[in-house]
Amino acid sequence: TTSYSWVNDTPSIGLASSGNGNIESLTVSNSGNTPVVATVIVTPTFENEGIACQGDSQTFTITVNPSSQVDEVDNQVLCNGDDSDEINFTTSNTSGTTTYSWVNDTPSIGLASSGTGDIASFAAVNNSTSPVTATITVTPTYTNEGISCDGPTETFTITVNPTAQVDDPQDQIICNGETTSVEFTTQNTGGTTTYAWANDTPSIGLAD
């Protein structure tokens, strides 16, 4: 009969520091941002007729990759027609390769519905009269030693405000000495619209 004993130099991965027999299924753990490598040494013992003979040990490793991670991304608020800021994804993961895939729930803003890697600057689009907010969800994937591990997603928003609009005021004809006022209105909603004006004939009593 051959039996086996083993020792593990890194029990933090979720495997005991030593044991006998086969290593049963276990849930591994790595709370850091770099791979953790555990070295396991297994020693066989052959027993027959009450005599035990120990054999040469064999060594193997269990590498536990960290969870893939992407740093928080700042939200953006843009005007219709503005160029967005380029978005360069970053991570605290090390000793491997982290790639990024993303989906955008509102491609009408001028950004594709999905993609991979960083997001280049694009011309923001909003032809409506109220703000449009797109939510972008990023999934990081960490690859090391040929094994890829997806991590928690990160979301951020890009809000595109509409072009400011003012309704066409009616021309006025009034008598000398009379008073009048003009109230500006807009079709814009979801924000605040302010108005600046200039008058080419201040002699009528209206500032320039």
Residue ranges with predicted function:
Residues T1-D208:
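Extracellular low-complexity Ser/Thr/Asn/Gly-rich intrinsically disordered segments
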